[in-house]
């Protein structure tokens, strides 16, 4: 897609050498050789010269925030990318996008009702519910997809419908839920609003080929520096309903309208001009970068086919912040992580702990309810998260594959 700068020139695909952090080294043994570490996340941003050009234009316009020309163009560009039937509100970060989504979809709560959500997601999801006046009700996940389990939700709704204000559905790891239509039917049957947290999923598609962004009452994205589509700090709320997006814009500006009078509860959630400018540059060539990330997953799947790990369903059409895989057992997971460390490869095990096991929610257990979370506990005990980068070097991919294979062979 073509993106223009404030001066009207067309942005070219970012230079081959993008801004990346320095490389650290690991010494394998005393007196031995060193090898470069493979980082878990490698942010990929426009270079200093490109950022300087954007900042000069912003300084010349003397418009740094408050819905400036870059923000307006960025919102339109996001809509062009996601689909013309959608409407977009940009926000300062993904958390504020989620707060706005909950507020405009469910209204202000008084902490006497609950939002159904998986425990197997980032802890900011439950915190957002509390900030907007709702309590988390944790449901289990599906053993095959690791996405929120419809049957777990039904069991709660059928018994406690009057205590449930809505559904906060996570597209886990930014991967589109293959049962999204079933979830929407469930929400309609019980007259419950449904909001989708697709934080890491900008550029992902559902199994039917539709890009994330247009399901439920709304979906939100995070453009944090760790995401495949990143501006540093930023986010967006996307909906088919223009009125909901209009409310989101008011929410992020203290509820103010053109008369400078506040007509609804709000806060400051506006995206800065420099973040919007970065976003415009990041959109150029995005699909090529995402394709390169999916190629990494394909290599992992092929190379680890006999290593005893299973990758997430539908991840092959996701934007892939990282590659999640389940090991055969907790011991196998420990062996895989140990082998990765020895090979100077950074890895994680998201989402372990799940939300309900974070100390805040353990200490304040009266704030939450929970179904049986047996599958969540099992997946957390076996999951590993492997690095994925834009245009990841083949040698790095091969090193990750070899490390996982070695853990299986050695059976540590």
UniProtKB/Swiss-Prot annotation:
The modification N6-(pyridoxal phosphate)lysine is found at residue 227. The keyword Transmembrane helix does not apply. InterPro entries: DegT/StrS_aminotransferase, PyrdxlP-dep_Trfase, PyrdxlP-dep_Trfase_major. Pfam families: DegT_DnrJ_EryC1. GO terms for molecular function: pyridoxal phosphate binding; transaminase activity. PANTHER family: PROTEIN RV3402C (PTHR30244:SF9), TRANSAMINASE (PTHR30244). This is Protein Mb3436c.
């Amino acid at each position: 897609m073509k993106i223009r700068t404030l001066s009207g020139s067309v942005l070219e695909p970012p230079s081959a050498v993008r801004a990346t952090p320095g490389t650290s080294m690991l010494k394998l043994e005393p007196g031995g050789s060193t090898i470069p570490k493979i980082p878990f996340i490698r942010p990929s941003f426009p270079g200093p010269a490109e950022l300087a050009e954007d900042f000069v234009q912003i300084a010349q316009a003397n418009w740094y925030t408050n819905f400036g020309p870059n923000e307006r163009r960025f919102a339109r560009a996001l809509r062009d990318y996601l689909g013309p039937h959608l409407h977009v509100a940009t926000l300062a970060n993904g958390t504020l996008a989620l707060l706005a989504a909950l507020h405009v979809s469910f209204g202000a709560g008084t902490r006497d009702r609950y939002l159904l959500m998986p425990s197997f997601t980032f802890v900011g999801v439950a915190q957002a519910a509390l900030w907007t006046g709702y309590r988390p009700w944790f449901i289990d996940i599906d053993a095959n997809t690791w996405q929120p389990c419809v049957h777990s939700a039904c069991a709660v709704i059928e018994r406690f419908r009057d205590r449930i204000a809505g559904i906060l559905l996570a597209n886990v790891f930014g991967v589109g839920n293959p049962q999204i239509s079933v979830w929407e039917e469930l929400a309609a049957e019980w007259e419950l609003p449904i909001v989708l947290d697709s934080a890491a999923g900008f550029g992902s598609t559902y199994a039917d080929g539709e890009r994330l962004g247009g399901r439920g009452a709304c979906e939100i994205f995070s453009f944090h520096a760790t995401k495949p589509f990143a501006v540093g700090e930023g986010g967006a709320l996307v909906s088919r309903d223009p009125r909901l997006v209009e409310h989101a814009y008011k929410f992020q500006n203290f509820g103010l309208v053109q008369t400078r009078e506040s007509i609804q509860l709000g806060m400051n959630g506006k995206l800065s001009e420099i973040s919007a400018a970065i976003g415009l540059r990041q959109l150029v060539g995005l699909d090529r970068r995402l394709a390169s990330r999916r190629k990494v997953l394909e290599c992992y799947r092929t190379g680890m086919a006999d290593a005893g790990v299973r990758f997430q369903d539908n991840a092959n059409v996701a934007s892939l912040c990282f590659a999640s895989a389940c090991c055969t057992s907790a011991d196998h997971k420990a062996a895989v992580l140990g082998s990765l460390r020895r090979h100077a490869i950074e890895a994680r095990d998201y989402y372990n702990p799940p939300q309900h096991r974070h100390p805040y929610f353990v200490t304040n257990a009266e704030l939450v309810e929970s179904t049986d979370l047996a599958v969540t506990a099992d997946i957390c005990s076996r999951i590993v998260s492997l690095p994925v980068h834009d245009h990841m070097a083949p040698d790095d991919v091969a090193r990750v594959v070899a490390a996982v294979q070695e853990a299986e062979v050695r059976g540590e």
